[in-house]
Swiss-Prot record:
Major location category of this protein: membrane
Gene Ontology CC: plasma membrane; proton-transporting ATP synthase complex; proton-transporting two-sector ATPase complex, proton-transporting domain
Organism: Buchnera aphidicola subsp. Baizongia pistaciae (strain Bp)
Site for Reversibly protonated during proton transport, residues: 61
Entry's transmembrane regions: 11-31, 59-79
Protein's UniProt name: ATP synthase subunit c
PROSITE patterns the record matches: ATPASE_C (PS00605)
Subunit structure: F-type ATPases have 2 components, F(1) - the catalytic core - and F(0) - the membrane proton channel. F(1) has five subunits: alpha(3), beta(3), gamma(1), delta(1), epsilon(1). F(0) has three main subunits: a(1), b(2) and c(10-14). The alpha and beta chains form an alternating ring which encloses part of the gamma chain. F(1) is attached to F(0) by a central stalk formed by the gamma and epsilon chains, while a peripheral stalk is formed by the delta and b chains.
UniProt membrane topology term: Multi-pass membrane protein
Protein's gene: atpE
């Protein structure tokens, strides 16, 4: 591969990982604010809301992990 295509590959991987990280940070921030809002409204449901919060947070956080895996695969396997 020539230098231009390798440079484009590096940029593509960096953009993929960066956007995934930004998206996860925004998603978890919104999720956390809604969790705190729900606990403030219904303090009796704290344990139920906390369980649902952690399940959904794991799902939101899974997408960037997949993107990092794909980015590293593109980076090291395409060469």
């Amino acid at each position: 591969m020539d230098n231009v295509s390798m440079d484009m590959l590096y940029i593509a991987v960096a953009v993929m990982i960066g956007l995934a990280a930004i998206g996860a940070a925004v998603g978890i921030g919104i999720l956390g604010s809604k969790f705190l809002e729900g606990v403030a409204r219904q303090p009796d449901l704290t344990s139920l809301l906390r369980t649902q919060f952690f399940v959904v947070m794991g799902l939101v956080d899974a997408i960037p992990m997949i993107a990092v895996g794909l980015g590293l695969y593109m980076l090291f396997a395409v060469i």
